[in-house]
Amino acid sequence: MEKRRGPPPCQSGSGCSNPAKIRKAKDGAQLCGPCFSRNFEDDVHEAIVNNKLFKRGERVAIGASGGKDSTVLAYVMKTLNDRHDYGLDLQLLSIDEGIKGYRDDSLLAVEKNRVEYGLPLTILSYRDLYGWTMDDIVAKIGKKNNCTFCGVFRRQALDRGAFKIGATKLVTGHNADDMAETLLMNVLRGDIARLERCTNIVTGEEGDLPRAKPLKYCFERDIVMYARTNQLEYFYTECIYAPNAYRGYARKYVRDLEKVHPRAILDLIRSGEKVSVKKEVEMPTLKICERCGYMTSQKLCKACLLIEGLNTGNTDLGVRKSKKSKKVTVEADELNKEGGCGSGGGGGGCGCAGAEDAAENEETRQRLKDLQF
């Protein structure tokens, strides 16, 4: 009888003789637990250094939702900050949308992270910022367009929270899977402005608060494995109001594509990095919202329009898009968003916002003609 083979040795290249127990999704390397963790951390450190994401002395807000991405992001940022002496002042920033049975539970996980990591935590709520909770909004308008409201409000809330604590940069838990899905969604929507920049590791440089994505090249499966290997506690439940979010369809497509072509995720990201837009595509001029002071290309920002609609009962205000002119233009709130609510990893990328606003086939084809790959 043939003897059963044990696991292969660790392939870290560091001389480790431990048996390999983890296959890294990103490159297929077979590693032991400790070497996998170190390899994962080295990948993030390389992305930070190569892209010069931070400067010594910066106060960095970490978007924290309590989910796996933001939990791993906070842990790795603290680990690398200590190990490599980045000299960063790290602080956790959470947004309470007011969703009972979901956000209140996830914030308990964030509180545990605060205690364990020893990082300051600031929580801002939709109720305090906008006078509405998501439970209130869904009760008024139903679930059809609720992701649009949440996406706009959450992104602005993160910016306001970061400014409140004096942060010079906001980091979010977008991972490689998120980036590939967002790229695909923007192609399907024909969203030229976002398509050109949705895979950037730093966005928002044209405004006051840049956003960085240190986990950009980390696969979701590796993030889950890292959390388990390091026994990190995080919140598992998905948002109860977004069971049919647009991103879900893109995610399934990317997963199916990955089964056939394992490098599909990285290839999609690399393709996005090479996208450029023709000069004749008109981009908006950013200015300040007359009501709240947030960036917009209109007199009022999208958040203020949505709030006005809720307060006056005209809930289509700010939700329905007007007919496009022949010249392709993009509203500033669309330019600023990176693919939804920015909740991916507690700060970026759910992509549910605007699911019902996907472009008609003919308009999509016309817009894609303006792209250069």
From Swiss-Prot:
Subcellular locations according to the entry: Cytoplasm
EC numbers for this chain: 2.7.7.-
Disruption phenotype: Required for normal germline maturation and for viability. Viable at 20 degrees Celsius. At a higher temperature (25 degrees Celsius), the hatched eggs progress through the L1-L4 larval stages with kinetics similar to those of wild type but present an important delay in germline maturation. Whereas gravid wild-type worms are present 53 hours after hatching, germline maturation are still ongoing in the mutant after 66 hours, and the first adults containing eggs are observed 75 hours after hatching, when a large number of new L1 are already present in the wild type.
One Pfam family cited in the UniProt record for this chain: zn-ribbon_14
UniProtKB keywords: Cytoplasm, RNA-binding, Transferase, tRNA processing, tRNA-binding
Gene Ontology CC annotation, any one: cytosol
Coiled-coil residue spans: none
Function: Plays a central role in 2-thiolation of mcm(5)S(2)U at tRNA wobble positions of tRNA(Lys), tRNA(Glu) and tRNA(Gln). Directly binds tRNAs and probably acts by catalyzing adenylation of tRNAs, an intermediate required for 2-thiolation. It is unclear whether it acts as a sulfurtransferase that transfers sulfur from thiocarboxylated URM1 onto the uridine of tRNAs at wobble position.
Lineage: superkingdom: Eukaryota
GO aspect biological process, one term: oocyte development
Pathway per the UniProt entry: tRNA modification; 5-methoxycarbonylmethyl-2-thiouridine-tRNA biosynthesis
Name of the molecule in the record: Cytoplasmic tRNA 2-thiolation protein 1
InterPro entries: CTU1-like_ATP-bd, CTU1_C, Ncs6/Tuc1/Ctu1, Rossmann-like_a/b/a_fold, TilS/TtcA_N, tRNA_thiolation_TtcA_Ctu1
Family of the protein in this entry: Belongs to the TtcA family. CTU1/NCS6/ATPBD3 subfamily.
SUPFAM superfamilies: Adenine nucleotide alpha hydrolases-like
GO MF annotation list: nucleotidyltransferase activity; sulfurtransferase activity; tRNA binding
HAMAP family per record: CTU1
